[in-house]
Amino acid sequence: MDHEHLVELAEAHLWGHFTAINNNVDGMRILERGDGCYLWDTEGNRYFDGLAGLFLSQLGHGRTELAKAAGDQAAILGYFPIWTYGHPTAIELAAKLAELAPGDINRVFFTTGGSEAVESAWKLARQYFKLKGQPERTKVISRNLAYHGTTMGALSITGLESIKTMFEPLVPGAIKVPETNHYRCPMCQDEPHCSLHAADAIEEAILAEGPETIAAVFLEPVQNAGGCFEPPPGYFQRVREICDK
């Protein structure tokens, strides 16, 4: 199918993510293949994929061994829910992830994507405390400018107002604290490195909301969509101390 016809079909039928449905797609780039870190469009232009396919193609495009593994699995068993059943590949992968995970993390709950993973984690935290006889623990804490997904619960935890306003009101109980942006931090402008003020703000939020109402704290290792903010040394250790307290 030629490029012009693909553009016509896209204009009539394709609704791109994070894109208004009435956006004019005339002249849009249509990517048709990839190899390593490069992509090619339907007009033969080559691009460097610096985004790694939205961070999910770190191993590169065109990996035939990965395609073969996926095809082999689909030929044996394409899909079956792991409710009260299991299957060898899921069990083996869960065991491998448990082996690689730090500390006593040894259980794996598979999801289909990041937003669903965040939703599931919030649900897990709520269910845990309800079973512990603490049903009032429903709130979660996350950072300003954080990105945790776009489904309703995950979007509530997300701290990017520009992608939230059209879907409000969102799920209540998602509390925000400062991000670790040293460049614009009013609390440590005169310090050579960002201090732990942002971590201490989590404790302040817990006390303000009531510790008996908090179920979980959601933090990206490095904030990405909000500006690539690396936390200062000791940040996560301090957060761990606060949560344990």
Question: What are these model-predicted stretches?
Answer:
Residues 48-51, 178, 216-222:
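Short beta-strands and strand-loop turn motifs
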Residues 95-215, 234:
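PLP-dependent aspartate aminotransferase-fold enzymes
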Residues 183, 220-233:
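Conserved PLP phosphate-binding loop immediately N-terminal to the Schiff-base lysine helix
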Residues 28-49:
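Active-site and channel-lining beta-strand-loop segments
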Residues 3, 46-134, 141:
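Glycine-rich loop-to-alpha-helix module at the N-terminal edge of alpha/beta enzyme cores
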Residues 229-245:
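Catalytic PLP-binding core of fold-type I/II PLP enzymes
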Residues 1-35, 198:
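Active-site-adjacent loop/helix segments that line or gate small-molecule/cofactor pockets in enzymes
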